[in-house]
Regions:
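Portal/gating segments that form or line small-molecule/metal binding sites
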Residues: 1-138
Length: 138
């Protein structure tokens, strides 16, 4: 059975998705787009930001989204920003496929996250994610 692919992204009304770096103005504005998620209890625990946090519907949506995800696909810019910001135990706990031109060996993190670097396009990354999801979740 083929798994479902769903698209999850934060985007401003003018189509802005990811900054060049977190240090520039666009990076700061991008972080403002994300501010709703960081107070959520599930995210605080998953990113090792401390105890407590909000437990409303936003928290449940974040938790449900992470729990139903068997593998993730992301671009190199998202990976680069996350590599600097994520704790040692990256928050995914699943295989992650990074679409990039950079050749790099898989990077395994504590807690079940392994980053795989895919050099031949999004279609290949999606195929690999589907295959990994099936083997990971069985």
């Amino acid at each position: 059975m083929a798994g479902k692919v769903f698209f999850s992204v934060s985007m401003s009304l003018d189509g802005f998705i990811a900054p060049e770096s977190l240090g520039d103005l666009m990076g700061q504005q991008w972080m403002e787009l994300q501010q709703w998620i960081f107070p959520q209890r599930f995210i605080r625990e998953n990113l090792k930001l401390g105890e407590g946090g909000e437990e409303g519907r936003d928290n449940e949506i974040a938790r449900e989204t992470f729990e139903r995800t068997g593998a993730s696909v992301m671009g190199k810019r998202m990976f680069d920003l996350g590599e600097q910001a994520w704790p040692e135990e990256a928050p995914f706990h699943t295989p992650v496929f990074v679409v990039t031109h950079e050749k790099r060996d898989p990077w395994e993190r504590p807690g079940g996250t392994t980053f795989h670097f895919v050099n031949d396009g999004i279609e290949t990354a999606l195929d690999q994610a589907r295959a990994a999801r099936r083997s990971w979740s069985t």
